[in-house]
Design a protein with these regions (language model features):
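Extended, highly charged alpha-helical segments
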Residues: 106, 117-180
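N-terminal accessory targeting/assembly segments
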Residues: 1-114, 118
């Protein structure tokens, strides 16, 4: 007789972040955050808090202002001691590689933006080989511009013996070549 084991998948908790700008009023931001929360739920995450900030436009460094970043960090620190700490922060916009890196450095949790969340959902739901390939291609296209400065700790790879080749290629160049 077969035994069935019911495994409980741990739901990852998340907070979501959106901006209220002159181009996007509070009502519209709330609608977008409702949709983002639904997407997070679809991906298997439970949203425990929303953060919004009223600004003229996103910061090129961290998307949100430093004060709001500190507020989110304090909330994450508070939740750290609880049974269910927050594992990710999801932003309701597309973030640059620089913004993701700076936010991850400040908050010490996984950072996602709307596009990466949607791609994750597609990857989870893809059934056929063709669908899986299309999703993987879309993920690579999304990742390609974000590779810059992810490998700053690595210098150029060795090129070969002196006089035969140049200094070699960087890890970034290798990753870009592989993805293409």
């Amino acid at each position: 007789m077969k035994e069935f084991v019911i495994s409980e998948t741990k739901v990852e908790t998340a907070v979501i972040v959106g901006l209220i700008t002159p181009q996007q009023n509070e009502r519209k931001t709330t609608e977008y955050l409702n949709e983002l929360e639904f997407l997070a739920d679809t991906a298997g995450a439970k949203v425990v808090r929303r953060f919004t900030q009223r600004v003229n436009g996103p910061s090129s460094v961290t998307y949100i202002g430093s004060g709001k970043l500190e507020e989110i960090a304090a909330f994450l620190k508070q939740k750290e001691d609880e049974e269910d700490p927050v594992g990710m922060v999801i932003f309701d916009d597309e973030l640059s590689a620089k913004q993701i890196r700076n936010i991850e450095k400040a908050l010490q949790v996984k950072i996602l933006d709307r596009t990466s969340l949607i791609l994750d959902i597609f990857a989870m739901r893809a059934q056929t080989a063709a669908a899986k390939t299309q999703v993987e291609l879309a993920q690579y296209r999304y990742m390609l511009p974000r590779l810059t400065r992810l490998w700053t700790h690595l210098e150029r790879q060795r090129g070969g013996s002196v006089g035969l080749r140049g200094p070699g290629e960087t890890q970034l160049e290798m990753d870009q070549r592989i993805i293409r």
